[in-house]
A protein has these predicted regions:
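Long, contiguous binding/interaction regions
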Residues: 1-85
């Protein structure tokens, strides 16, 4: 089995969510996290764009997305890109 790189966009619940705290929790909870970047959306709201390396075994990408969605302060997490490594 190989690995895939997932690029996910994470939308916080509101502009009041502490993104530095959310980044710290992502680093602690998401195995294979490689990169985190902030992207402005508008009206003071920013999203996070992250890169995660996971196994291409069935269900790994969905499990990663679900784990992120379960974090406090996260409104939505969606895989926007997927590539083989």
């Amino acid at each position: 089995m190989g690995n895939v790189v997932l690029i996910l966009r994470i939308m916080p619940e509101s502009p009041d969510v502490d993104l530095e705290d959310l980044k710290a929790r992502l680093r602690a909870e998401v195995k294979g996290l490689q990169d985190i970047r902030e992207e402005p959306i508008g009206f003071g709201l920013k999203s996070l764009k992250i890169a995660v390396v996971v196994s291409d075994a069935g269900g790994e990408s969905d499990a990663t997305e679900a784990k992120i969605m379960a974090l406090d302060g996260v409104e939505r997490a969606e895989i926007i890109e997927l590539t083989l490594t």
